[in-house]
Amino acid sequence: MSDVTLLRIGIAIVGILFVAAVFFFSTPKTSAHRVRTKKEEPPRERREPMLSTEADNSPPQGVDEVPASVSQQQVNPEANKPGEVQLGKRPTNHFDKIILLFVAAKAEHTLRGEDIVVAAEKTGMIFGYMNVFHRLVEGYPEHGPIFSMASILKPGSFDMANIREMQIPAISFFLTLPAPMTALDAWEKMLPTVQRMAELLDGVVLDESRNALGRQRIAHIRDELRAYDRQQQVPPLIKNSRW
């Protein structure tokens, strides 16, 4: 028998022994590990996405604490039934910028649910998707909201069945870009609405940092939105096919 044949037989025997050893030692250990994992693994707590962060009796803590009002929204089953018109729903979940304002109650006061609903109707907002209020493009509701308004308390929605008992420290207004119109035009729709809501509710307008919204901040936001609109109008760079 040649040396090559003996070498092949030796390799085959070693391979068989190795496979048998792996199977013998790994099978019981794997089974025990699976049983142990199954017994020790604690039940997972089901977590729902949220529309806004929980707030205390102080004014809101800024844009990072109010979930882009869009990215952590709590879905209300009644607001998402198949086949129903969902007024205020964005055509797409994509967004790249959010402008946030608040109307907060004055010290030692709260905003009453009934008053909020009346003020929202007076300023042209409608109750819709996610059980919050929206300003829509007149005649084109399918284009989605220009901006929306929610409670700063979880889950952010307005429970109309118990609206008379509702008392909250503030409401949030959020403009999510891209909007169904230019960013600057959308801002010019939102700002007077927020100011009017504050007037009707005897509240104060705050920016995303909990500061009173002043002229300087308003001018800065307008500049930001002009720059955003210019950026959106820049055509993409496409290489010439000849090159």
Swiss-Prot record:
User: Where would you find the membrane-spanning parts of this chain?
Assistant: 5-25
Task: Report the subcellular localization.
Answer: Cell inner membrane
Q: Which SMART domains match?
A: ZipA_C (SM00771)
Q: Does the record carry Cell inner membrane as a key word?
A: yes
Keywords (alphabetical) are: Cell cycle, Cell division, Cell inner membrane, Cell membrane, Membrane, Transmembrane, Transmembrane helix
Q: Which GO terms describe its biological process?
A: division septum assembly; FtsZ-dependent cytokinesis
Q: What is its main location?
A: membrane
Question: SUPFAM superfamilies recorded for this chain?
Answer: Cell-division protein ZipA, C-terminal domain
| Topology term for the membrane | Single-pass type I membrane protein
Kindly list the cysteine pairs connected by disulfide bridges.
Answer: none
Q: Which residues lie on this side of the membrane: Cytoplasmic?
A: 26-243
| Entries under NCBIfam families matching the protein | septum_zipA
Family the UniProt entry places it in: Belongs to the ZipA family.
Q: What does this protein do?
A: Essential cell division protein that stabilizes the FtsZ protofilaments by cross-linking them and that serves as a cytoplasmic membrane anchor for the Z ring. Also required for the recruitment to the septal ring of downstream cell division proteins.
Name used for this protein in its record: Cell division protein ZipA
Origin species: Xylella fastidiosa (strain 9a5c)
Upper classification of the source organism reads: Bacteria, Pseudomonadati, Pseudomonadota, Gammaproteobacteria, Lysobacterales
- Identify the gene encoding this protein: zipA
